[in-house]
């Protein structure tokens, strides 16, 4: 089950295509936004040995997939739910998983954080299912790389509610410092569809980024809702003000910082990544698969020096691609899920 309309969020289509193309499955795709398609598939729900709800159907809104609750209750095979945006709307998402008795929840989060987040969904098993690479779309192309540091992307909705501005501050830092480092930058806040994004990456020698998500996972969205309400009432509030009020004394936070598809796509195009130090689900290794920048930027001179070294940069992107192609494509991810659930 998926939802059409996410052409600029390529990972949701990459997961769909990987399941649909798996030689281990004979898969039917149900677009839950199709008023004819959806009821037809729900009437046949008992015909299926496995039911998968993908991120697009259980991400921004649960309204459409909720219409399938009664049908899902009558399924014969196990249900795997992939939730998108695991930093928002978690009350509804956890409630859905419990109401339909999902046997498996596939999470993009580091596994211990995911188990904490979905503890109320017991006995559902939580599967580590982070993003991956689609090597048929994200691959190298002929042509010059005229941009040193590039970026295309959009800001999170309600960014203050995440509790940090790491990526925004990082981009601002590179825009302001580019001239002194003699780097050509092309940084703007817009989202490209997959083919256009891949073409842009192939014009870039490098991109900058940070882990996705929040340091403050919550099962009930209490802090997120409070921040959104506060900012709505105080539209001129600064991030520092919001952080001091809602996050500075936050007790025992559980981090939901994670690797995302945006960290795999440059690997496919051999575009060097300069990333803020982080764990990246233990998949990408600092200074082997990307150049690691300290969170206080204290090693920026060394980072720029290494980035400008063509030989170093070439060896790094080659290593990253070999590593990811060996273990971290969407084909690998789907096979691992199927190994667990069938």
What residues fall within each predicted segment?
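Aromatic-residue-lined binding/catalytic grooves and analogous aromatic/hydrophobic interfacial grooves
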Residues: 124-131
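A conserved nucleotide-sugar
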Residues: 168-186
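Extended catalytic core of nucleotide-activated donor transferases of GT-like folds
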Residues: 1-122, 134-138
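Conserved donor-binding/catalytic core segment of Leloir-type glycosyltransferases
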Residues: 143-162
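Catalytic binding pocket for nucleotide-activated donors in carbohydrate/polymer assembly enzymes
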Residues: 1-32, 80-81, 98, 196-342
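Acidic anion/phosphate-binding donor-loop and adjacent secondary structure
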Residues: 132-145, 195-196
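Active-site donor-binding acidic/aromatic loop of nucleotide-activated sugar
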Residues: 184-190, 210
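Glycine- and acidic-residue-enriched helix-capping/strand-helix junction motifs
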Residues: 5-12, 158-168
